[in-house]
């Protein structure tokens, strides 16, 4: 059927419902984790899908993005929290087809360069696809985490590309 206003509204409603449910589960099961932002999206294949369970039954695609807050000094520390977030999300009434967990430092990397202290010039992104990856250990999640280096403005654009490598993050005159 057409992507009519009815299906659109249902998608939005289920996306919001999913966001709220996931956030509540994270607060209950992992109260130490600081969530900066969370957004769930439901893409419905047909207007048959009325509940989150319907979406999981093959009537749509669910994705969830969780942005974390705080300071991580390693990918391992980030991955531990990703595991806790994933545990919480797995208790929701529906499972995400895609779970994306991200973290960026609060400080301005340029300032930490100027002050000579180089903490927090990395940002982390973990993308889990499909239900099998939701069962991964924190170690597997750490390996899957993409690390981007935020050393200067020029690098922020190249950080978008998959091919971004550590060597290109050296400062050029």
Residue ranges and their predicted role:
Residues 12-20, 72-80:
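Soluble non-cytosolic domains of exported or imported proteins
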Residues 20, 24, 28, 80-83, ...:
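Solvent-exposed, polar/charged alpha-helical surfaces in well-ordered, non-transmembrane soluble domains
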Residues 16, 46-47, 81-84:
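Short amphipathic alpha-helical surface micro-motifs
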Residues 73-96:
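Short, non-transmembrane amphipathic alpha-helical segments
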Residues 21-23, 27-69, 94-173:
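Polar/charged, Gly/Pro-rich intrinsically disordered segments
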């Amino acid at each position: 059927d057409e992507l009519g206003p009815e299906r659109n509204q249902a998608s939005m409603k289920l996306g919001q419902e999913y966001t709220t449910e996931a956030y509540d589960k994270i607060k209950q099961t992992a109260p130490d984790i600081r969530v900066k932002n969370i957004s769930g999206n439901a893409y419905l294949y047909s207007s048959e899908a009325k509940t989150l369970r319907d979406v999981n039954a093959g009537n749509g695609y669910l994705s969830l993005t969780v942005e974390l807050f705080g300071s991580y000094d390693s990918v391992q520390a980030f991955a531990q929290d990703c595991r806790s977030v994933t545990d919480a999300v797995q208790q929701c009434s529906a499972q995400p087809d895609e779970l994306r967990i991200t973290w960026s430092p609060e400080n301005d990397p340029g300032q930490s360069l100027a002050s000579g202290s180089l903490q927090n010039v990395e940002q982390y992104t973990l993308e889990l696809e499909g239900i099998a990856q939701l069962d991964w250990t924190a170690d597997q999640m750490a390996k899957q985490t993409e690390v981007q280096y935020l050393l200067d403005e020029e690098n922020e654009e190249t950080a978008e590309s998959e091919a971004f490598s550590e060597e290109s993050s050296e400062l050029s005159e």
